[in-house]
Each structure stands twice: as C-alpha cells, then as structure tokens.
Regions:
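Conserved acidic donor-binding segment of nucleotide-sugar-dependent glycosyltransferases
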Residues: 192-193, 197-203
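A conserved nucleotide-sugar
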Residues: 84, 88-135, 143
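Carbohydrate-associated surface elements
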Residues: 32, 54
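Short alpha-helical donor nucleotide-sugar binding micro-motif in glycosyltransferases
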Residues: 139, 147-152
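Membrane-proximal helix-turn-helix segments that form the acceptor-binding/catalytic region
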Residues: 7-26
Length: 203
C-alpha cells in the first residue's frame, strides 16, 4: 500500500484511494491487509475479499537428502521497511551464543533510499565485526534461492510492515522455519514452535 512505502508518495496514495472507492470489490492477501485497507482508505470491509497467495510447489519442494548447514537467510528488497538493520543486530547478539553461522541477505536496493540503506547496512556489518557472518548477494534467480533454502536452517524476516510475507510460505514449503516479529500478517501464518518463531522484539 502506498501509505506505507519508503518515501511516501501522495500521488500514488490518491490514485489507490480513487481506484478502491470506485471498485465493486477489492482483494486482500491477509486479514491484516483487509483491515488495513478498510481503515486507511475508509473502505467498506464487505467490499474487501481475502484471497491468500499461493506458491509453485513444483519449484519450492524440499530435497529431503540435502545436508543443511548453519546458514540463515534474509530474503527481500533492501529498504528500511524490511528491517534488515534489526536482523544484523540480532545476528550480533546471536554470535555471543553461537559463532558458527553465516547469514545471506538476498535482494537488491529498492525505493528512494535503498542504495543508501544498503551502504549503511554494510557499514553496520563492519562496525560489528560481522564480515565473516554476513554476506550480501543482492538479486538471485528463484532456482538459486531454492538451492540456498535447501541448505539453510532458518529464514529471518524482520520487516516492519508486511501485508503478506510470501517468502515465509516459500521457506516453510522447503522445510525451513521462519523467525519473525509478531506484527503485520505473520501471526496469521507463523505459529511458534510449529513452523517458526515469533517475537515482539528480536533485539
């Protein structure tokens, strides 16, 4: 939704509101998004129908013979909304109890300040002496992401705002639990101790 984009775009928000108020029906990917649309744009909730996104299970199917390593993944566009800074802080704390791990950040910079944010993240890694534990891979094809999911033990997703975290469903489909914050749509799809872990704060 435009009202939550990095670098608030009034023109986009106005267009979204015009489209939504003029439409007979609106689709939302989660209960969270359904409520958000209704409250943010003053839309009758009865007009909003929830249709949960699916995934290609022929692609995101686990290799049961794969040898999983101490690899963590953070997959998503590099922008402040996605909360990668929190992930790095979490990794810095985690290192105090376990030093044998590496976390790959997959995704390119996005939004008005994405490139600047990526530079800040890399500086944060250096300041915390996490160079051997954190690697930035930027954009990768789905086939390569699947390979990494087969090798990984955890997906970390610390987005500040997520109407539907498709990457979490993809990871679960590959047998990878998800560590995330108790916000947005994640309480609808992640159940602590079952397919992942939720926390109010990770640091």
């Amino acid at each position: 939704l435009g009202v939550f984009l990095d670098g608030y775009n009034k023109e986009r928000v106005d267009c979204e509101k015009l489209i939504m108020t003029s439409s007979n029906y609106i689709t939302a990917s989660s209960n969270f998004e359904q409520n958000l649309i209704s409250e943010s744009y003053q839309i009758d909730k009865n007009k909003i129908k929830k249709i949960t996104p699916g995934i290609d299970r022929s692609l995101f199917a686990p290799d049961l013979s794969a040898n999983r390593k101490n690899i963590f993944l953070s997959i998503g566009r590099i922008q402040q909304q996605k909360g990668q800074r929190v992930t790095i802080d979490f990794l810095n704390n985690f290192r105090k109890v376990e030093n044998d791990f590496v976390c790959y950040f997959i995704g390119g910079p996005s939004g008005n300040s994405g490139k600047e944010y990526l530079v800040e993240l890399k500086e944060q890694v250096v300041e915390l002496n996490l160079e051997t534990h954190v690697k930035f891979l930027e954009n990768l094809p789905q086939t390569k992401i699947k390979e990494l999911l087969n090798e990984s033990k955890l997906l970390i997703h610390t987005s500040q705002f997520e109407t539907f975290g498709l990457v979490a469903i993809e990871a679960n489909s590959m047998g990878v639990p998800v560590l995330s914050t108790n916000s947005g749509s994640f309480p609808e799809m992640i159940f602590s101790g079952v397919n992942g872990y939720l926390a109010d704060n990770l640091v």
